Amino acid sequence: MSLQNAEANLKEFGKELNLEGLAFDENHTCILGIDNTFSLHLTYEPNSDRLYLYSPILDGLPKDDPSKLKLYEALLEGSMLGGQMAGGGVGVAVKEELILMHCVLEMGSGADPSSLRRFAPLFVESVEKWRERAKNIIEGRDPGATGIPGGGPIGGGGQPRPPGKDDDNPKPGDRFIKI
């Protein structure tokens, strides 16, 4: 039943892309080229009833340790609880010099046949932002590992506030609604 859900999701996604006949191969994988810049891999895993989406963020790791550290910090910060990664995460294959961003869609009984169609644009947009961010870090054009695609200091300034000017700073709990 779950493979049928994954196939229905892929078919619905194919209709959205005007790619009728989109199907999984014998390994339950479908690979799509995105704007001739990167690939979107869709793999159904029958043992877990999950559809995995994954794409390369970077192919080739920085050679110098400071750039590598800055890149890893940005990726780790951005992937905390999936916050900047469409709810997913990131992994590094050091020997292969590859960084992949990934997400999972449940395909068990009752899975919505349009969940992939609705989710894929968000995932692709996030991959594009992280690819740009990684490129900027490697090229030395990223001012800080903030976890925000595009970099830059949080708040946009980066200048320390003069003493006594902390009134605009939120206090712990200010951004939360008490229920």
Task: Show the residue positions of the predicted features.
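Short, highly charged C-terminal tails/helix-capping segments
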Residues: A134-I179
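Hydrophobic residues embedded in beta-strands of well-ordered beta-sheets
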Residues: C30, D49-L51, E97-I99
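Structural motif
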Residues: E26, E45-N47, K95
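Charge-rich, low-complexity N-terminal segments
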Residues: M1-H41
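Well-ordered alpha/beta subsegment
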Residues: G87-P121, K135-D142
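Short, internal acidic amphipathic alpha-helical interface segments
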Residues: I57-E97
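Short, well-structured hydrophobic secondary-structure segments
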Residues: S39-K63
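Helix-rich interaction surfaces within compact, conserved domain-sized segments
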Residues: A120, V124-E128
